[in-house]
Amino acid sequence: MVRYSLDPENPTKSCKSRGSNLRVHFKNTRETAQAIKGMHIRKATKYLKDVTLQKQCVPFRRYNGGVGRCAQAKQWGWTQGRWPKKSAEFLLHMLKNAESNAELKGLDVDSLVIEHIQVNKAPKMRRRTYRAHGRINPYMSSPCHIEMILTEKEQIVPKPEEEVAQKKKISQKKLKKQKLMARE
């Protein structure tokens, strides 16, 4: 079994998915992965489908040299964005795989959240292109490894009002006074 870079806090309530040596650009995939990190699984799936249809963009925050500006990036508080279709499709496949893993484990698929997603560089694949005057230049591809961990989100239960009212702070002086009154 392959080791993940992060162990889930509660392994019984989480599921994993990974892909190795995927023929998709590392930089585009990294930016797309950062955009869906922490999202609910249904929201992430809808977002990635919208990216392929160019209805929502992926904000390019780190690898943004020469990336043009787009109005859709304003939703993310950013100016530069693109629509990396292939990266979105690969991540959609990974989410689908993680979802089926969750069903197999018996988890509630509708409450899954992307807790951890990581994109690493894979060994480059080498090709060549022919240039003027008999020269040859490299024509490399930048594949990547992707891993993700999805976790069932617990519902936050509000505390009863009685307990909240009881926890009022009392100074040491008042506490001693109350004890003295109780003795008498």
UniProtKB/Swiss-Prot annotation:
One of its GO terms (biological process) is translation. Gene3D superfamilies: Ribosomal protein L22/L17. Keywords: Cytoplasm, Ribonucleoprotein, Ribosomal protein. One of its GO terms (molecular function) is RNA binding. Expressed in pancreas, lung, colon, cystic duct, gall bladder, kidney and liver. Expressed at high levels in the well differentiated pancreatic tumor cell lines HPAF, COLO 357 and Capan-1, the moderately differentiated pancreatic tumor cell lines T3M-4, AsPc-1 and BxPc-3, the poorly differentiated pancreatic tumor cell line MIA PaCa-2, and the pancreatic tumor cell lines of undefined differentiation status such as SW979. Expressed at lower levels in the poorly differentiated pancreatic tumor cell lines HCG-25 and PANC-1. PROSITE patterns: RIBOSOMAL_L22. It comes from the Eukaryota. Component of the large ribosomal subunit. Component of the large ribosomal subunit. The ribosome is a large ribonucleoprotein complex responsible for the synthesis of proteins in the cell. HAMAP family: Ribosomal_uL22_A (MF_01331_A). Belongs to the universal ribosomal protein uL22 family. This is Large ribosomal subunit protein uL22. It comes from Homo sapiens (Human).
